[in-house]
Regions:
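Acidic two-metal-ion nuclease catalytic site recognized across multiple nuclease folds
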Residues: 1-3, 165-216, 221-224
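Conserved non-catalytic scaffold segment of RNase H-like nuclease domains
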Residues: 1-111, 116-118, 132, 139-152
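Residues immediately flanking
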Residues: 16, 96, 123, 233, ...
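Acidic, Mg2+-coordinating catalytic module of metal-dependent nucleases/exonucleases
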Residues: 91-108, 134, 138-195
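A short, structured active-site edge motif that brings together acidic residues
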Residues: 117-127
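Core beta-strand-centered patch of the WYL/Sm-like small regulatory domain
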Residues: 196-267
Length: 267
């Protein structure tokens, strides 16, 4: 890929709106994506998603998406494969990729979509290099500077701004249609990865927990309440410095993520 000309590569700007900031616990409520190339071709993907959980008010204040707006929308399971087909042959372009890609990566893993750890190009990093005159590099600030009408903090609008920032960066960089992707990466720097990592052994070894083996745990929630739960571990994951166990929880009758450090006992 590094020797391919920029003109021949498909890019895809992606943005998500979610119920919170932690992909281990929070859910996606909207996906917006724009697939494009330097020749000017464009195609978009957009959907609201029913997260099957309440959207907190403090998050609604950011993106404006309410429970009522998503109650008749498809679930993530209904759209994830079509979304994967849309982005799979593209280089992803994201504003702060580690956030959005971690949500997407975990959803792909849960649905059994075989993909390498997701990575993308970071328009925050690029904006800091090429728009250093701005007071900050938020999408709203960049949109205003570039004369883009973006009044709503919504996924597709933000993906479009992300695409426009990327195209402006290419223009300002001095690269042309004969430049290679490798030359662009020399400007961008190292690609940005999802923060989601699979852990198949470390938690199991330390805590004597095995995938597919039902266990009983004592779990302390954020309020300090301790509950006894029967769980069936499905996967171990790591997000940042925190490790989680993805498991079927018999108490809730659904899949849950348990923070490993909050498990205070195993029977």
């Amino acid at each position: 890929m590094f020797n391919e000309k920029l003109l021949t590569i498909n890019f895809c700007a992606v943005d998500l709106e979610t119920t919170g900031v932690n992909p281990a616990f929070d859910k996606i409520v909207e996906i917006g994506a724009v697939k494009f190339n330097l020749a000017g071709d464009k195609e978009d993907f957009h959907t609201l998603i029913n997260p099957k959980v309440h959207i907190p008010y403090n998050v609604v204040r950011i993106h404006g998406i309410t429970d009522e707006m998503v109650c008749n929308s498809p679930s993530i399971e209904d759209v994830v494969f079509s979304f994967y087909d849309f982005i799979k042959d593209s280089v992803l372009v994201v504003h702060n990729p580690s956030f959005d890609l971690s949500f997407i990566d975990l959803v792909f893993k849960k649905q059994g979509i075989a993909s390498r750890r997701l990575w993308g190009l970071d328009t925050v990093r690029l904006a800091r290099k090429f728009f250093c005159e701005l007071p900050n590099h938020k999408l709203t600030t960049l949109a205003s500077y570039l004369g883009i009408d973006c009044r709503n903090h919504r996924a597709l609008d933000d993906a479009i701004v992300c695409m426009m920032v990327f195209l402006e960066v290419v223009k300002r960089s001095g690269l042309d249609e004969n430049s290679t992707f490798g030359e662009f990466m020399n400007i961008h720097g190292a690609r940005v990865n999802s923060k989601i990592l699979r852990e198949k052994s470390e938690i199991a070894t330390a805590r004597k927990i095995a995938i597919g083996k039902k266990i009983t745990i004592r779990y302390c929630d954020t309020d300090g309440n301790v509950t006894v739960r029967n769980i069936l571990p499905k996967e171990f994951i790591q997000y940042g410095k925190n490790r989680y166990i993805v498991a079927h929880c018999y108490l809730r009758g659904a899949e849950r993520c348990f923070l490993e450090s909050r498990i205070i006992g195993i029977e």
